[in-house]
């Protein structure tokens, strides 16, 4: 199904060097692309293929399992075509950044702020990249796998747990 998906065919035609992987699982297609081309690819998906809704932006931390360490995931929906597409782009730990797609979908603005706040991925050229959930003085990014379980500077609980 993934290889016959219209979006996949068009992406491979226009961005053959940027499409790194295509997978299909339970009817949902995921396309992994180069992070350097994320804005151009997203512009194409919105303007040419009618993926007019960015429903979510999130990130996965693959600490110790694969490189690049982070994967930024964009969940897209085409209202006229009633079709979903997941786009992923790898982000290395060193220089942990990717260009913002808030210029493509305004809804991505706060979603990218959440990813920045909780995972520490910087979105280049974002109009207002600052914490959205944690306080401004919070140290670190609590959804990273190397973040201390009890929080920064706290001793592990020594009492009974059950």
From Swiss-Prot:
Entry keyword annotation includes DNA damage: no
One annotated GO molecular function is: NADH:ubiquinone reductase (non-electrogenic) activity
Protein's name according to its UniProt entry: NADH-quinone oxidoreductase subunit C
Classification lineage: Bacteria, Pseudomonadati, Thermodesulfobacteriota, Desulfuromonadia, Geobacterales
Subunit organization: NDH-1 is composed of 14 different subunits. Subunits NuoB, C, D, E, F, and G constitute the peripheral sector of the complex.
Gene3D superfamilies with a match to the protein in the record: NADH:ubiquinone oxidoreductase, 30kDa subunit
Stated membrane topology is:
Peripheral membrane protein
- This chain's source organism reads Geobacter metallireducens (strain ATCC 53774 / DSM 7210 / GS-15)
Read off the PANTHER family from this record. Answer: NADH DEHYDROGENASE [UBIQUINONE] IRON-SULFUR PROTEIN 3, MITOCHONDRIAL (PTHR10884:SF14), NADH DEHYDROGENASE UBIQUINONE IRON-SULFUR PROTEIN 3 (PTHR10884)
A Gene Ontology cellular-component term: plasma membrane
The entry sums up its family as follows: Belongs to the complex I 30 kDa subunit family.
What's the EC number here?
7.1.1.-
Where found in the cell?
A: Cell inner membrane
Q: What does this protein do?
A: NDH-1 shuttles electrons from NADH, via FMN and iron-sulfur (Fe-S) centers, to quinones in the respiratory chain. The immediate electron acceptor for the enzyme in this species is believed to be ubiquinone. Couples the redox reaction to proton translocation (for every two electrons transferred, four hydrogen ions are translocated across the cytoplasmic membrane), and thus conserves the redox energy in a proton gradient.
The record's Pfam families line, in alphabetical order, gives: Complex1_30kDa (PF00329)
Annotated transmembrane regions: none
